[in-house]
Structures are given as structure tokens and as C-alpha cells.
Amino acid sequence: MLTLKIAVYIVVSFFVLLFIFGFLSGDPTRNPGRKDFE
């Protein structure tokens, strides 16, 4: 049960970091080249 909880925490933290980095790097207001993002 402990390994399952650890795996869930790892997956959740990974997606959160991915979302944060993707939002910061692909922010339309700071990135004029939106054609590359799409």
C-alpha cells in the first residue's frame, strides 16, 4: 500500500511540474510566436 501511495505522489507531482513548466514556457502573453505553440 505504501508503494502505491508513493507512485501516486510521484505521478501527481510529475504532472504538476509538467503543467507549471508548460504554462511558463508556452505563455501566450510572453511568447509572441504562438504559431509555434500550436
From Swiss-Prot:
NCBIfam families: PRK02655.1 (NF002735). One of its GO terms (cellular component) is plasma membrane-derived thylakoid membrane. GO terms for biological process: photosynthesis. This is Photosystem II reaction center protein I. Belongs to the PsbI family. It is found in: Cellular thylakoid membrane. SUPFAM superfamilies: Photosystem II reaction center protein I, PsbI. HAMAP family: PSII_PsbI. One of the components of the core complex of photosystem II (PSII), required for its stability and/or assembly. PSII is a light-driven water:plastoquinone oxidoreductase that uses light energy to abstract electrons from H(2)O, generating O(2) and a proton gradient subsequently used for ATP formation. It consists of a core antenna complex that captures photons, and an electron transfer chain that converts photonic excitation into a charge separation. Keywords: Membrane, Photosynthesis, Photosystem II, Reaction center, Thylakoid, Transmembrane, Transmembrane helix. It comes from the Bacteria. The chain crosses the membrane at residues 6-26. PSII is composed of 1 copy each of membrane proteins PsbA, PsbB, PsbC, PsbD, PsbE, PsbF, PsbH, PsbI, PsbJ, PsbK, PsbL, PsbM, PsbT, PsbX, PsbY, PsbZ, Psb30/Ycf12, peripheral proteins PsbO, CyanoQ (PsbQ), PsbU, PsbV and a large number of cofactors. It forms dimeric complexes. Pfam families: PsbI. It is a single-pass membrane protein.
